[in-house]
């Protein structure tokens, strides 16, 4: 009787292990493709996108949208740094393929054929100055990107445009922002 009870418990344990492994395999089969081809986590490192994003901000990157639509001006993207693809950068799109970006006296101008206009960057605080005068004509597969913290950003003003094939995706959502949570201005009255 004892042998049958041990055998029954062993069979039950083995079945539970197999059931657990099957659940893990099914979960992996669902999660892996989503993680690889649709959404990707990204943790901000550095001050180049302040005050929009801070070091430690945990973001979700949408990798799917740009397979169907082109990136647009103002999108915040994550991309492989063109000179070292192992590094991932986060910046805002300023210039689109075929345009010329002209930075003169702290102002950003966009040339589209015979049209030229000053870029109105409403997402930047009013005290932000765009330094490093530069003019760059973009090819049909290139984007001009800059960080929102213009004084502390290494971007297209320094190392040139981002090729389309280096773009990983656009920022979809901020999941967690330690700086914004822990820097809340708390006051207590007596």
Functional labels for PLM-detected ranges:
Residues 2-18, 22, 33, 37, ...:
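Soluble "head" domains of membrane/secretory-pathway proteins
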């Amino acid at each position: 009787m004892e042998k049958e009870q041990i055998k029954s418990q062993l069979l039950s344990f083995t079945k539970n292990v197999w059931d657990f492994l099957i659940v893990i395999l099914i979960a992996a089969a669902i999660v892996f493709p989503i993680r690889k081809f649709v959404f990707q986590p990204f943790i901000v490192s550095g001050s180049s996108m302040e005050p929009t994003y801070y070091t430690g901000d945990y973001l979700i990157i949408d990798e799917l949208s740009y397979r169907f639509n082109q990136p647009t001006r103002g999108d915040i993207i994550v991309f492989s740094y063109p000179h070292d693809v192992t590094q991932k950068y986060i910046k805002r799109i300023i210039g689109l393929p075929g345009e010329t970006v002209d930075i003169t006296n702290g102002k950003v101008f966009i040339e589209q054929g015979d049209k030229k206009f000053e870029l109105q960057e409403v997402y930047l605080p009013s005290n932000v100055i765009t330094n490093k005068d530069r003019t760059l004509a973009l090819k049909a597969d290139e984007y001009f990107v800059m960080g929102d913290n213009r004084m502390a950003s290494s971007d297209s003003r320094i190392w040139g445009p981002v090729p389309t094939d280096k773009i990983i995706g656009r920022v979809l959502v901020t999941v967690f922002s330690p700086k914004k949570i822990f820097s809340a201005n708390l006051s207590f009255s007596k």
